[in-house]
Amino acid sequence: MITLEVDLGERSYPIHIGSGLLDNAELLRPHVRGQHAVIVTNETVGPLYAARVEQALAALGKTVRTVTLPDGEAFKHWETLNRIFDALLQAGADRKTTLVALGGGVVGDMTGFAAACYMRGVPFIQMPTTLLAQVDSSVGGKTGINHPLGKNMIGAFHQPNAVIADIDTLRTLPPRELAAGMAEVIKHGAIADADYFAWIERNIQALNACDPELMAVAVQRSCEIKAGVVAQDEREGGLRAILNFGHTFGHAIEAGMGYGAWLHGEAVGCGMVMAADLSHRLGFIDIETLARVRTLTQAAMLPVVAPELGADRYIELMKVDKKAEAGSIKFILLKKLGEAFITSVPDADLRATLAHAVLKPPTEAPVA
């Protein structure tokens, strides 16, 4: 087992990465201080892993309740969130009750938001079971739900007590979900570590096959990068924005196609190619670097061609992005491989990237 730390002073917390961690009651013991625990999972993950976590908590003498949500980005909204609140209230949960997010990014985001809101804040633990959640969304305290007009527009910063990433859970991921997680792995190399990016290039076929040793390396390095950024800028006042590389375009794809048509990681993968194209058009990266981003994204079984929503529709959706200021869209671009920055861009260059990126006619599922 590898243990990292997100250094936030009194609110610092560990990230445990390894095999067989779902059953490890001793990892949970320091972080479940009250008598009651509520596991939040979904219809896919629950039957696979919930009983193991229930048993670990019961071994600590805790009273355990499990809430099972529908699976998918399409359910990341108020109605589903209220299921968590209903369960907490019906169980008589108090301020010492610990929530446990057992699932992917949607479960983690909603459980964290419920923890931030219930009684104005209760503790929670992230137990991510997808690659995307293990390398990205479980770390950093961003929580929230979607709104029909924008992704993750309603939420809060609420740090977990711990992140427990059992890489054994990656073995049960469908290939499409594994690929979606690889988008965030590639992102971390692109924005912060050119050597890591090159390592991913060399090992992409084995990573696609979910080689356990290489996957453990990827989860560790991605968590190191994200934890380092979050420690410097917890609430995204500056540096943390670079973690949104590919997300401005990606969120527009998700909203424009309808939440769930594209997985979040698929939209981010395509968005990274679009952001790299824009970086090249503005003279920051050369054509070879653009080609490397596109080639690696495609090799990870991710889409590199965007749906045709129309340039005006893309721009309308991107103006709702949280990074936008006074209607000005902000993009995370590459200065070079391994270094990113935030900027606004000329409208003509943005429209050129959008025109170059799309495939006609629109597709219901992403095209690699």
From Swiss-Prot:
The gene is aroB. Catalyzes the conversion of 3-deoxy-D-arabino-heptulosonate 7-phosphate (DAHP) to dehydroquinate (DHQ). Zn(2+) binds at residues 184, 247, 264. Its main location: cytoplasm. Binds 1 divalent metal cation per subunit. Can use either Co(2+) or Zn(2+). GO terms for molecular function: 3-dehydroquinate synthase activity; metal ion binding; nucleotide binding. Pfam families: DHQ_synthase, DHQS_C. InterPro entries: Dehydroquinate_synthase, DHQ_synth_AroB, DHQ_synth_fam, DHQS/DOIS_N, DHQS_C. Keywords: Amino-acid biosynthesis, Aromatic amino acid biosynthesis, Cobalt, Cytoplasm, Lyase, Metal-binding, NAD, Nucleotide-binding, Zinc. It is found in: Cytoplasm. Its EC number is 4.2.3.4. GO terms for biological process: amino acid biosynthetic process; aromatic amino acid family biosynthetic process; chorismate biosynthetic process. It catalyses: 7-phospho-2-dehydro-3-deoxy-D-arabino-heptonate = 3-dehydroquinate + phosphate. GO terms for cellular component: cytoplasm. It is an enzyme of class 4 (lyase). It comes from Cupriavidus taiwanensis (strain DSM 17343 / BCRC 17206 / CCUG 44338 / CIP 107171 / LMG 19424 / R1). CDD domains: DHQS (cd08195). Coiled coil: none annotated. This is 3-dehydroquinate synthase. NAD(+) binds at residues 71-76, 105-109, 129-130, 142, 151, 169-172. Its cofactor is Co(2+); Zn(2+); NAD(+).
